[in-house]
């Protein structure tokens, strides 16, 4: 029947994906618990397929538990840097050290299990809210799911739905607002209690008021956890201990919010433009 034929084609495609071998090999398969210190030395990256150079001679370090803001416009190399920190690719030149060890020495599964990522485009399954948050846990744990929802400031929203955590999302269920989606995505990233948290321009789709509310709840989540806030909005990165400004794959400025404003360069210009352009940067987020 046509359904069986369609299923066969789908299975073939899935098998092709499952049979693919990764080029990323772990040199020593280290599986230690991370503290979260990161050091990037003279990192450059060229995309192998297109030959486009996305990053040029990037260097910075973050102590365990600190927050780094990475600011830049579209195409500046922000997300490429996030992908390298998750070891989706290996650097063309230079190195990334995690807790003083080259990133290649860690077991990929162990490394990635300790990194929580909130992507720009949230993908939620047609499943319950609980299962969407629990995605990434080996065993669903209601206490951890509940705590993650509270930390992401979406717990009360969930309780307001008729079936609470068992509420279905997607085609057969309800549709969440942009802010609720992002909060569920944040809960999903932190439910596995990662040592490193990467926010990849994840607040670009929400309005400023929602952004400030989410940033306030993120402050608690980021405390004592190495966090990287990637954004084109200055308001998202204001909280960071250290901020780097990327332009065409290079670091053009670095400092904290105050010192970067005093430099009156790219960062300050972006801040002024975004503040005047209606993307108000409220002090409440500080």
Tell where the protein language model's regions lie, with residue ranges:
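Coiled-coil segment of the histidine kinase dimerization/signal-transmission module
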Residues: 17-20, 135
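Cytosolic ends of transmembrane helices, especially the final helix of ABC transmembrane type-1 domains
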Residues: 1-17
């Amino acid at each position: 029947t046509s359904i069986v034929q369609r299923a066969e084609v789908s299975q073939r495609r899935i098998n092709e994906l499952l049979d693919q071998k990764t080029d990323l090999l772990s040199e020593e398969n280290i599986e230690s618990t991370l503290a979260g210190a990161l050091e990037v030395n003279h990192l450059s990256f060229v995309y192998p397929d297109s030959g486009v150079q996305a990053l040029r001679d990037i260097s910075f370090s973050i102590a365990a538990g600190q927050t780094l803001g990475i600011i830049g416009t579209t195409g500046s190399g922000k997300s490429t840097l996030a992908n390298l920190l998750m070891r989706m690719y290996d650097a063309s030149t230079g190195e990334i050290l995690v807790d003083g060890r080259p990133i290649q020495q860690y077991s990929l599964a162990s490394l990635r299990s300790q990194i929580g990522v909130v992507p720009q485009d949230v993908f939620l399954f047609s499943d319950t809210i609980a299962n969407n948050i629990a995605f990434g846990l080996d065993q669903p744990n209601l206490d951890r799911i509940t705590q993650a929802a509270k930390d992401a400031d979406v717990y009360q929203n969930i309780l307001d739905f008729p079936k609470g955590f068992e509420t279905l999302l997607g085609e057969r269920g309800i549709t969440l607002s942009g802010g609720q989606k992002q909060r569920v995505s944040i809960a999903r990233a932190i439910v596995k209690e990662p040592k490193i948290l990467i926010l990849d321009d994840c607040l670009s789709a929400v309005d400023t008021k929602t952004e400030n509310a989410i940033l306030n709840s993120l402050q608690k989540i980021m405390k004592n956890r190495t966090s990287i806030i990637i954004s084109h909005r200055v308001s998202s990165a204001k909280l960071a201990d250290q901020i780097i400004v990327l332009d065409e794959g290079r670091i053009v400025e670095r400092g904290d919010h105050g010192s970067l404003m005093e430099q009156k360069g790219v960062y300050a210009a972006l801040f002024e433009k975004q503040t005047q352009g209606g993307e108000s940067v409220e002090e409440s987020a500080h």
